[in-house]
Amino acid sequence: MNAPRCLRRLLERQWRQGGWLSTLLRPLAALTGLVVARKRNAYLTGARAAWRAPVPVVVVGNIYVGGTGKTPVVIEVVRQLQARGWTPGVVSRGYGVDVGAAPRVGQGQLAAADYGDEPALIARATGAAIAVHPHRPRAVQALLRAHPGVDVVVSDDGLQHLALARDVEIVVQDERGVGNGRLLPVGPLREPAQRLADVDAIVTNAGRPRAAAAPAAGAPRQLAMWLEPTHAQRVTDGATRTLADLAALPPARLAAAAGIGNPARFFQTLEQAGIRPAHTLALPDHYAYAQSPFTALDADLILVTAKDAIKCAALDDPRLWAVQVGTRLSDPDFGDWLSATLRARQP
């Protein structure tokens, strides 16, 4: 195991249990809090100016470092807006891609090597135009130049990118909530937990169906999200199999692999659908698949996420099947609320 992964696991253990390292790192957490507060106050007081786009902006992000399930929420937000007559475009950092000075703008079947894993998946799932660049205002400007019909921008991540003014903030968390409630590196938080009181909605990736919380006046809208597998699609040729077919296979001949922020969540989703692979392979997030990690897997069929499937295609392994999922929300009125909120906040 490489050094960065070992350090990450050590930190995560300290976040859960405490210990000598947490005590040692407390001064750094205090420094994190100071830097975050100064940056936010600079924008709130006008000392630093945020750039405002000529169209509404929805930011989907988190305060918990690591994978909480933002990408499915971004996809669902785009689809909900499309269903209500909006023409959304998406901006993203393009993690792991050397974009260069100018933003990269595309649409449709984008390559992960050119745009990043999440942007490629979002573009394929929604058909929305997408621009990638670390500087969010620059990405929005390029997106609107290339696609002037876009009338709302959805920012994939970017809650902490305050240089881009936003009209709606949606935070995605999982059942870990705010963890131990401490800032990096003593805890998992990029911003203080109190930041959640300022956002418009909090979506909890519950992993299973859950009822929506009753809206409270003046508080963020609270709802749950979970992923529901629909079918599997072979990576090499697009052939499909039903969930019942997969569940009927002998577990000993079935494997599952995931190179996402929280691989265990993917394996749990399969189990809830009655699919119990005997072999599971947890890979690092944004795994490149430059070489096949499946060579030693003794399985007739290997299930992967849709995000992994984009990069697995080059492996030309007929055992690989991408599990397609639908995003379910506990709040049936979320899309109407989001659309109405955006229209109310338009100048």
Curated annotation (Swiss-Prot):
Pathway annotation: Glycolipid biosynthesis; lipid IV(A) biosynthesis; lipid IV(A) from (3R)-3-hydroxytetradecanoyl-[acyl-carrier-protein] and UDP-N-acetyl-alpha-D-glucosamine: step 6/6
Binding locations of ATP: 64-71
Swiss-Prot/TrEMBL keywords: ATP-binding, Kinase, Lipid A biosynthesis, Lipid biosynthesis, Lipid metabolism, Nucleotide-binding, Transferase
Pfam families named among the record's database cross-references: LpxK
Reaction(s) this enzyme catalyzes, per UniProt: a lipid A disaccharide + ATP = a lipid IVA + ADP + H(+)
Superkingdom, taxonomy of origin: Bacteria
BP-aspect Gene Ontology terms: lipid A biosynthetic process; lipopolysaccharide core region biosynthetic process
Molecular function, one GO term: tetraacyldisaccharide 4'-kinase activity
Keyword Signal in annotation: no
InterPro entries: LpxK, P-loop_NTPase
Keyword Secreted: no
GO cellular component: plasma membrane
EC identifiers of the protein: 2.7.1.130
Family named by the database record: Belongs to the LpxK family.
Biological role stated in the UniProt entry: Transfers the gamma-phosphate of ATP to the 4'-position of a tetraacyldisaccharide 1-phosphate intermediate (termed DS-1-P) to form tetraacyldisaccharide 1,4'-bis-phosphate (lipid IVA).
NCBIfam families: lpxK
Name of the featured protein: Tetraacyldisaccharide 4'-kinase
Lineage summary: Bacteria, Pseudomonadati, Pseudomonadota, Betaproteobacteria, Burkholderiales
